[in-house]
Amino acid sequence: MAEIVLDHVNKSYPDGHTAVRDLNLTIADGEFLILVGPSGCGKTTTLNMIAGLEDISSGELRIAGERVNEKAPKDRDIAMVFQSYALYPHMTVRQNIAFPLTLAKMRKADIAQKVSETAKILDLTNLLDRKPSQLSGGQRQRVAMGRAIVRHPKAFLMDEPLSNLDAKLRVQMRGEIAQLQRRLGTTTVYVTHDQTEAMTLGDRVVVMYGGIAQQIGTPEELYERPANLFVAGFIGSPAMNFFPARLTAIGLTLPFGEVTLAPEVQGVIAAHPKPENVIVGVRPEHIQDAALIDAYQRIRALTFQVKVNLVESLGADKYLYFTTESPAVHSVQLDELAEVEGESALHENQFVARVPAESKVAIGQSVELAFDTARLAVFDADSGANLTIPHRA
């Protein structure tokens, strides 16, 4: 186990492309840290620099307090688990797990003991004499993890290890990986493009885009207090709703009404450089069917009428999709997010509310919705910064 520190780390290529820019990150001993972002954001490059598979252009990487920039991968005492299982097809499960210990010329009795202990942890004991071709996808991934665990390294590096599994198996393996990491207490860096994996697995999450760490925090911090429009739109499913707005002396003007902001929120916004244009973000679960809220909730809610275009029932909840006549919001960060997620401009003015299953709203119906004005976020449309979290000079 070890602390991993990336101190002003940069990665540039001869063609001038910069994959990672000035990354400052301390991964605590025993922490489960997730690197998440769209393709090409720099997350795998970061993992490869920690592993020693990519050279660091500038900055310093320290593992357990020791500078390792110049150390070969084999000398860093870390273990990697890849998207592809990378198992030897001619070897049994036992031989695959034992392989790194065999390379290290460990005594056969010690190898047998460590393989047995690892197989027990991963529930592979009954499969030790099978070949990879006789295993399911989930079992193969557990064998790949076993090969990493058996070495007792300082850290695990995992590069999208669940991508090849079907949806049901991914959920199962997510839980198994989380429990295993807590049990072993080994520092783990995990790369994924799947925000659900990021939010459910990590102690902390690093959202990356354009080679830059957009925000580093707990899953709750990223969801409740996104640093900017990119993080707000990337984290959460369905995504946060964004409405055009204008700041007033006491609050905001939205396409469907006026919002008075609490004095403390006004104070936080005032501490930021004054924006020319603002965008208001509201999570789908904070927009409710007004027929289902009580009198107290109505006091601080803004209500508005919309026509529902689509209703999706998910059992415990329903998603109500609607449009407004207001102009669509535009910002550099939201346009970039739409591009990386392949969203069409046809849906740029579509919004979604998450309501309880007892809502009687039907497709094509006009309905009164309400959102809690205390649960909105205000963003600078130009810089993308969240104006409702304290400004850092």
From Swiss-Prot:
The gene is sugC. A motif (Helical C-loop) lies at residues 135-139. It is found in: Cell inner membrane. InterPro entries: AAA+_ATPase, ABC_transporter-like_ATP-bd, ABC_transporter-like_CS, ABC_transpr_MalK-like, ABC_transpr_MalK/UgpC-like, Mo/tungstate-bd_C_term_dom, NA-bd_OB-fold, OB_MalK-like. Monomer. Homodimerizes in the presence of ATP. The complex is composed of two ATP-binding proteins (SugC), two transmembrane proteins (SugA and SugB) and a solute-binding protein (LpqY). Residues 4-235 form the ABC transporter domain. Contains an N-terminal nucleotide-binding domain (NBD) and a C-terminal regulatory domain (RD). The keyword Cell cycle does not apply. It comes from the Bacteria. ATP binds at residues 37-44. CDD domains: ABC_MalK_N (cd03301). It catalyses: alpha,alpha-trehalose(out) + ATP + H2O = alpha,alpha-trehalose(in) + ADP + phosphate + H(+). Optimum pH is 7.5. Active between pH 6.5-8.5. Unfolds at pH 5.5. It comes from Mycobacterium tuberculosis (strain ATCC 25618 / H37Rv). Its main location: membrane. This is Trehalose import ATP-binding protein SugC. Its EC number is 7.5.2.-. Belongs to the ABC transporter superfamily. One of its GO terms (molecular function) is ABC-type carbohydrate transporter activity. Part of the ABC transporter complex LpqY-SugA-SugB-SugC, which is highly specific for uptake of trehalose. Involved in the recycling of extracellular trehalose released from trehalose-containing molecules synthesized by M.tuberculosis. Trehalose uptake is essential for virulence. Responsible for energy coupling to the transport system. GO terms for biological process: biological process involved in interaction with host; trehalose transport.
